[in-house]
Amino acid sequence: MTTNDLRELFLDLNVKFDEELKKYTNTKTGGKADVLAFPDSIEETEKLIKIAKKNNVPLTILGNASNLIVKDGGIRGLVVILQHLDQITVDGTKVTAQAGASLIGTTRVAAKHSLTGMEFASGIPGSIGGAIFMNAGAYGGEIKNIVESVKLLTRDGEYKTYTVDELDFGYRHSRLQSEDDIVVAATFKLEHGDIKKIRERMEELSFLRASKQPLEYPSCGSVFKRPAGHFTGKLVYDSGLQGYTVGGVQVSKKHAGFIVNIGNGTGKDYLDVIHHVQAVVKEKFDVELETEVRIIGED
């Protein structure tokens, strides 16, 4: 399908054509999307998906483009970033957030209503949709422990709901990783708590994160899953890889579990660093480092 064909299909919608994705990814890398959309409502999202389905346009859904690496060749077809779907509501001890709402923002709303259970996520720079997709977690907490249900939109434009038991959560895993359904909202079951203690815990975790993680540089967060019996950062550090650099991408000198863009890094730079780290850790410790970050797009 030509660029002109795509323009005709999506002309009446609020989209961008041939847009550089590096403007929107947390790594500040990534080639062009043929069509890029930021829907303002679930209904608009549904319309975009139906157009793509009807016309066989490839479709890629992103939350807020945080825990992923987009390759330099970009992404063909339609890319939908859900960050404008950010409504958050509270009903008793239940918090419902749309897929594009930030985890940080959702934890703050929960805290404002003296609801506890979500503090662990207060420093995770991702969206609700992405957090469900990969069962995000930190500091001993995981999304699976607080989710009650998730509302999904199928590629056919139909809606369905999964309970937590139906999502097949595991370590950085959910069944959504092998399915095409799109998270549009999630409901969390929390508990009443002491607002002072909730905020103290959130401040404590924010301090820990700022003191240990390289927040001063663009990154995709934690790159590798934690292998059983090991700490990823220690394996990388003990392999002598801290500070290893390709182009503008570097294994962080502050935390060896992070890979950062120190200036004009590319998707290829990221992948070259990742593959080198995997190879060296495998050679030195016979441990396979599996990526946690989502890698998409064309070379």
Curated annotation (Swiss-Prot):
Its main location: cytoplasm. Residues 29-193 form the FAD-binding PCMH-type domain. Its cofactor is FAD. Its EC number is 1.3.1.98. It catalyses: UDP-N-acetyl-alpha-D-muramate + NADP(+) = UDP-N-acetyl-3-O-(1-carboxyvinyl)-alpha-D-glucosamine + NADPH + H(+). It is found in: Cytoplasm. One of its GO terms (molecular function) is UDP-N-acetylmuramate dehydrogenase activity. Keywords: Cell cycle, Cell division, Cell shape, Cell wall biogenesis/degradation, Cytoplasm, FAD, Flavoprotein, NADP, Oxidoreductase, Peptidoglycan synthesis. Gene3D superfamilies: 3.30.465.10, UDP-N-acetylenolpyruvoylglucosamine reductase, C-terminal domain, Uridine Diphospho-n-acetylenolpyruvylglucosamine Reductase, domain 2. The active site is at R172, S222 (proton donor), E292. Belongs to the MurB family. This is UDP-N-acetylenolpyruvoylglucosamine reductase. It comes from Ligilactobacillus salivarius (strain UCC118). The gene is murB.
